[in-house]
Amino acid sequence: IGPSTTLNFYVLAQSLRHLLRVGDEIVVTNQDHEANIGCWRRLSEHGIVIREWRVGKADGELDLNDLDALITDKTRIVCATLCSNIVGTHNDMAEIVEMAHRVGALVVADGVSYAPHVIPDVKTLGVDFYAYSTYKTFGTHQGVLWGSSEAMKKTEAQGHFFNEEKSRYRLNPTGPQHAQIAALAGITEYFDQLHQHHFGESALSLHQRARQTFDLVGEHEAKLANILLDYLKDREGIRILGQDHAVPGERASTIAFHARAMPSNHIAEQLSHSKIGVGAGDFYALRCVEALGMDPADGVVRVSMVHYNTAAEVTKLVETIDSILPGK
């Protein structure tokens, strides 16, 4: 557990550097948040070759065939997100893992924008490292980095030498933030209370209860997302990033769009006057915004819907956007 996922990825990159030789290759995407890109790109200073898995210019999605063409017998690490924070489509991580492991490469998965919507099973996914931020799961601002036991053995300790054999300290060069870490217990309690509210008392295990809760969350969020997506795809001059229809397990309820008729920050500002909170900008996915041919200074409007939002709120959002944008 560290201060942020960005820092956790940076420390991880440094811990794996000793495995790499001049000419070895790392695959990164231009879809990810910069946290899972920049730290790996910096390793090019040591002769490591960075190969970029690029998004489609129409919708911002990644094509597995393109990854297959990038992976070689020199590939050592593949870095990708389970869900882009602006594209929203769930990437097929199990297939990414299969392709990477075929040549013995490690897989580093960013689950930050995936975590609020889906509870992962890292062993089923088969990833070597998985990271997410606890503020995305309604807790304090911390970053969690998980590594399989075999993958952790390949890391070079980044903390004090006398803690090298302690896995919880191995990739933590600083002391833990005790108060914030203690507060993380509230996340489990919150989701357990959510389960009890909808399902009552249960003899299921904590993990089983969480999965049941997140299945319900996914169904609800897809309904919310489709209210907005159905409007946006029929509105002239609107460009939607990612899929234009939400299916649980395939698309998150994080919807980013660009309006030809009005700057993104103007839309966000106008919505705030109606007490509707959305974001505008590049959301640290600047490379993705640029790849889609958009101006990073303008970026996109991002609507982040989660389980506690309601259909009435999304309907109000749609009506307000419609009143803000000129024309029909």
Task: Give, region by region, the residue ranges found by the protein language model.
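Pyridoxal 5′-phosphate
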Residues: 1-328
